[in-house]
Swiss-Prot record:
It catalyses: an N-acyl-L-alpha-aminoacyl-tRNA + H2O = an N-acyl-L-amino acid + a tRNA + H(+). NCBIfam families: pth (TIGR00447). Its EC number is 3.1.1.29. This is Peptidyl-tRNA hydrolase.
């Protein structure tokens, strides 16, 4: 499998969305940029903010689409074309309702699972053959409560758990960058004792 060259965090732009559950993908790439000393800059031709990060001997592009979540694919596909990156070399970090806070999971391929940023990306690519980092935000219990849930802020305990999941995913990332996704998944998916 190809090594990763582009890591995208999904979220909604603007300070009013900064700490919402829906911005778990932004939270991941922001933490990654902070840990590696990468600096964000606006890139209008890619419809987002970009940074170049050096991680475990690999140079990787980071992207935060400045479009709203539902239009994330526009930014992602523009970046893939501009940097001549194959979808298989892409990792998209996003919030995941079906995982509890404190849980993060890597996966390759599949559908959008109702996540609108993934939906738009899959629509524009014509397939779902790319890597995902699913950051658990929990589910409110009923589908009618999903929109206010994802657009709301997590409580203190859930927020800390989401932060721990982000840190664990960053710790597993060097294995994925080496193209060793099975080992990265094993490290991330195995409960700590």
């Amino acid at each position: 499998m190809s090594a990763l060259r582009l890591i995208v965090g999904l979220g909604n732009p603007g300070p009013e969305h900064a700490q919402t559950r829906h911005n778990a993908g932004f939270r991941f790439v922001d933490a990654l940029a902070e840990r590696t000393g990468a600096r964000w800059g606006l890139d209008s031709k890619l419809f987002g903010e970009t940074a170049k990060a050096d991680i475990a001997g690999h140079t990787v592009w980071l992207l935060k689409p400045a479009t709203f979540m539902n239009l994330s694919g526009k930014s992602i596909t523009a970046a893939l074309r501009f940097w001549k990156i194959e979808p298989e070399q892409l990792l998209v970090a996003h919030d995941e309702l079906d995982l509890a806070p404190g849980t993060a999971r890597l996966k390759f391929d599949g559908g959008h699972g109702g996540q609108n940023g993934l939906r738009d990306t899959i629509r524009l690519l014509g397939h779902g053959k790319f890597h995902r980092l699913r950051v658990g935000i929990g589910h409110p219990g009923h589908k009618d409560r999903v929109v206010p849930w994802v657009l709301g802020r997590a409580g203190r305990d859930d927020d800390m758990a989401i932060g721990e999941a982000v840190d664990a995913a960053i710790d597993a990332l060097p294995l994925a960058l080496d193209g060793n996704f099975n080992e990265a998944m094993k490290r991330l998916h195995t409960p700590k004792k």
